[in-house]
Amino acid sequence: MEQTYQYAWIIPFLPLPVPMLIGVGLLLFPTATKNLRRMWAFQSVLLLSIVMIFSINLSIQQINSSSIYQYVWSWIINNDFSLEFGYLIDPLTSIMSILITTVGIVVLVYSDNYMSHDQGYLRFFAYMSFFSTSMLGLVTSSNLIQIYIFWELVGMCSYLLIGFWFTRPVAANACQKAFVTNRVGDFGLLLGILGFYWITGSFEFRDLFKIFSNLIYNNEVNFLFVTLCAVLLFAGAVAKSAQFPLHVWLPDAMEGPTPISALIHAATMVAAGIFLVARLIPLFIVIPHIMNLISLVGIITVLLGATLALAQKDIKRGLAYSTMSQLGYMMLALGMGSYRSALFHLITHAYSKALLFLGSGSVIHSMETLVGYSPKKSQNMVFMGGLTKHVPITKTSFLFGTLSLCGIPPLACFWSKDEIINDTWLYSPIFAIIAWSTAGLTAFYMFRIYLLTFEGHLNVHFQNYKNTPFYSISLWGKEGSKRINKNFPLLTLLTMNNHEIASFFSKKTYQMDQNVRNITQPFITITYFGNKNIFSYPYESDNTMLFPILVLVLFTLFIGFLGIPFNQEGANLDILSKWLTPSINLLHQNLNNLIDWDEFAKDAIFSVSIAFFGIFIASFLYKPVYSSLQNLDLINSFVKIGPKRIFLDKIINGIYGWSCNRGYIDAFYATFFTGGIRGLAELTSFFDRQVIDGITNGVGVLSFFVGESIKSVGGGRISSYLFLYLSYVSIFLLIYYFLDL
């Protein structure tokens, strides 16, 4: 066992040869490297698989022995200052390593086919492998400086991947927005690290926690300064995990390829913030105000993310806001001190969200045969619907992911979300009501995405109804036929204007600037699943894309049993609690207590009921449009024109405006922060040009005129110089004489 831990340092570096060899190959042998480009997918998967096996071995030893292993090397030693590099293997490290490697492998296999058409194929796999290296280095770090280095590398990789299609201005702006927003949090993180080093004199986690606890116990620190440093540390996690108010970069990050979205939202970038708070939880728990702040930010993010997802038209952005809300649940759990439930939800959400993103990628891939390469169309749920018969495997898989995120048993997210909601009742009834209500909103918007994508009829082929009052079928459309608005208020949710429908049926293919090439045979091939390519309709994805989706379905079905919250006499079924035995859990400090079946069933029924209510509302509002038209008179008999209907329309329009305008937070930032910074820049520029340059230029002009004046006085005659000299001396002597008097 000791030997296994000694070689754990190799974990972050195993995926690193792929980007290095690709870079060297493109530099020295560009033609050969590009011709053999499909080979790199296999090498990336192989190296990450080795890391996964290594991580599983470490995890088994962690579960059996509950040990913590740390190894450090001295890098810089100078008098009282020393900087060490090393690695730390504990339950948190082993959990994150398995999460990163398993999700990373399925995403890489999926990407081989998804990116086969792209000229940036080699660049994509180089970035992905380096992303895995950076994240693995982050989770194995043994001190704050090492974490900060890999933290910045993760941010750099996300910048490169979000802006992968940098020839598209929208993607270029998105990666810049993500980079700048994260710089705010990263600057706070750096200041917090330096602050705690100034307080404790150590960067190492174990020394830092011990010294800081003693200082707090003996009341030897400035509590205000300590709180400020802790807030700055937390700011880094807020930005990286897209928590309010630094969440604005997350929906724009969807401009990258879909496999990148799956990796970022499941196991890498957004998980880094949760990991950082979990790693520093022994530091935060001795500062009660910080724990309260963490839980407050978490509950705000839970509700905000859910409300922003309610009316999204872009399938990936809807899932992005879902990620934001679920990360809020994890942050809420950490703020409450429920360490176990936070990590449990991190695990279950990662596999479910990876499944949903890869499923959405399969849908987008199939829609591109109809609408061409145009993300505004291929990702727009307005054009979808009725995909069940065209992509049945993707549909079934997406349904499993949707039900899991809704919290329906026995799927993965049910177990973890239910545990967080139950813990919230112990912490704060107000927070519990918000968390419980948001679970219903989650079920509503997730099932809405599912219904608009797969149920009903294919909306692109809905042109037979374009001359009727009911032909338009957008999601929350603000503009629509007046005949519809007068007769049927619920169809205001399903309207769009006539000009948008005209371009639905264009046969023009929109290719990305210089980034698209002909599709070639994937390097990785999987057994046939029975998919057929019928290009007049969406078609099921290739086997290489379906296989990772089906693997994630298995994870979504069974990974929740890893943390079953009840044990029986003589049988310890709660593997996760056993795994986390050395860790801190404030709400459940005795994890060996047996939980009563009746109590568990009551809590589960309470949380599942709100999920089913959300699903019911979504099914009522977003059932197939054709069925709505057939039952139009029946529905109109219940919904009459009057004050109540006008009030309902105002609520719907308010929800639409709030969601589509991102809660007006981006507009607020653009007006006050961006506008304010630009105004300050213009003022600084004016001051520099008019004042600073004016002084410099004025001195130069004055010197010029003085020189010219002196030049005109001096004529080159020595007698004139002597006369002036004697005159000045005489004047000086007279002044000196009169002053002495």
Swiss-Prot record:
<feature type="transmembrane region" description="Helical">
    <location>
        <begin position="185"/>
        <end position="205"/>
    </location>
</feature>
<keyword id="KW-0618">Plastoquinone</keyword>
<dbReference type="InterPro" id="IPR018393">
    <property type="entry name" value="NADHpl_OxRdtase_5_subgr"/>
</dbReference>
<comment type="function">
    <text>NDH shuttles electrons from NAD(P)H:plastoquinone, via FMN and iron-sulfur (Fe-S) centers, to quinones in the photosynthetic chain and possibly in a chloroplast respiratory chain. The immediate electron acceptor for the enzyme in this species is believed to be plastoquinone. Couples the redox reaction to proton translocation, and thus conserves the redox energy in a proton gradient.</text>
</comment>
<feature type="transmembrane region" description="Helical">
    <location>
        <begin position="9"/>
        <end position="29"/>
    </location>
</feature>
<feature type="transmembrane region" description="Helical">
    <location>
        <begin position="605"/>
        <end position="625"/>
    </location>
</feature>
<dbReference type="Pfam" id="PF01010">
    <property type="entry name" value="Proton_antipo_C"/>
</dbReference>
<keyword id="KW-0934">Plastid</keyword>
<feature type="transmembrane region" description="Helical">
    <location>
        <begin position="147"/>
        <end position="167"/>
    </location>
</feature>
<dbReference type="InterPro" id="IPR003945">
    <property type="entry name" value="NU5C-like"/>
</dbReference>
<keyword id="KW-0874">Quinone</keyword>
<keyword id="KW-0150">Chloroplast</keyword>
<feature type="transmembrane region" description="Helical">
    <location>
        <begin position="721"/>
        <end position="741"/>
    </location>
</feature>
<feature type="transmembrane region" description="Helical">
    <location>
        <begin position="546"/>
        <end position="566"/>
    </location>
</feature>
<comment type="similarity">
    <text>Belongs to the complex I subunit 5 family.</text>
</comment>
<keyword id="KW-0520">NAD</keyword>
<feature type="transmembrane region" description="Helical">
    <location>
        <begin position="40"/>
        <end position="60"/>
    </location>
</feature>
<dbReference type="Pfam" id="PF00662">
    <property type="entry name" value="Proton_antipo_N"/>
</dbReference>
<keyword id="KW-1133">Transmembrane helix</keyword>
<dbReference type="GO" id="GO:0048038">
    <property type="term" value="F:quinone binding"/>
</dbReference>
<feature type="transmembrane region" description="Helical">
    <location>
        <begin position="396"/>
        <end position="416"/>
    </location>
</feature>
<keyword id="KW-0812">Transmembrane</keyword>
<dbReference type="InterPro" id="IPR002128">
    <property type="entry name" value="NADH_UbQ_OxRdtase_chlpt_su5_C"/>
</dbReference>
<keyword id="KW-0472">Membrane</keyword>
<dbReference type="InterPro" id="IPR001516">
    <property type="entry name" value="Proton_antipo_N"/>
</dbReference>
<keyword id="KW-0793">Thylakoid</keyword>
<dbReference type="GO" id="GO:0009535">
    <property type="term" value="C:chloroplast thylakoid membrane"/>
</dbReference>
<protein>
    <recommendedName>
        <fullName>NAD(P)H-quinone oxidoreductase subunit 5, chloroplastic</fullName>
        <ecNumber>7.1.1.-</ecNumber>
    </recommendedName>
</protein>
<dbReference type="GO" id="GO:0008137">
    <property type="term" value="F:NADH dehydrogenase (ubiquinone) activity"/>
</dbReference>
<dbReference type="GO" id="GO:0015990">
    <property type="term" value="P:electron transport coupled proton transport"/>
</dbReference>
<keyword id="KW-0813">Transport</keyword>
<feature type="transmembrane region" description="Helical">
    <location>
        <begin position="344"/>
        <end position="364"/>
    </location>
</feature>
<keyword id="KW-1278">Translocase</keyword>
<feature type="transmembrane region" description="Helical">
    <location>
        <begin position="89"/>
        <end position="109"/>
    </location>
</feature>
<feature type="transmembrane region" description="Helical">
    <location>
        <begin position="258"/>
        <end position="278"/>
    </location>
</feature>
<dbReference type="GO" id="GO:0042773">
    <property type="term" value="P:ATP synthesis coupled electron transport"/>
</dbReference>
<dbReference type="Pfam" id="PF00361">
    <property type="entry name" value="Proton_antipo_M"/>
</dbReference>
<dbReference type="InterPro" id="IPR001750">
    <property type="entry name" value="ND/Mrp_TM"/>
</dbReference>
<feature type="transmembrane region" description="Helical">
    <location>
        <begin position="318"/>
        <end position="338"/>
    </location>
</feature>
<feature type="transmembrane region" description="Helical">
    <location>
        <begin position="425"/>
        <end position="445"/>
    </location>
</feature>
<feature type="transmembrane region" description="Helical">
    <location>
        <begin position="125"/>
        <end position="145"/>
    </location>
</feature>
<keyword id="KW-0521">NADP</keyword>
